[in-house]
UniProtKB/Swiss-Prot annotation:
Protein name (Swiss-Prot/TrEMBL): Large ribosomal subunit protein bL31
Sorted UniProt keywords: Metal-binding, Ribonucleoprotein, Ribosomal protein, RNA-binding, rRNA-binding, Zinc
GO terms, biological process: translation
Highest taxon of the lineage: Bacteria
One GO CC term on file: ribonucleoprotein complex
Subunit description: Part of the 50S ribosomal subunit.
Cofactor details (free text): Binds 1 zinc ion per subunit.
The organism of origin for this protein: Alcanivorax borkumensis (strain ATCC 700651 / DSM 11573 / NCIMB 13689 / SK2)
Residues engaged in binding Zn(2+): C16, C18, C37, C40
Family, as annotated: Belongs to the bacterial ribosomal protein bL31 family. Type A subfamily.
Amino acid sequence: MKAEIHPDYQTATYTCSCGNVIETRSTKGGDMALDVCSACHPFYTGKQKQADSGGQIDKFKQRFGMMRSKKD
């Protein structure tokens, strides 16, 4: 095996917006901020968030539902 062709591994710290801190090793190293992690992601926690905010689906149906009735 050739010597010194592989990058060096450094300690990397990933901090989630929920406060969870993950320490691992990476070739990039350094600190990184995450939006979601396995501790707060809805898929892993089982808590689903409501996607319809402000009646966006109703607004869409009202706007484009009328187009369908005109063609019929």
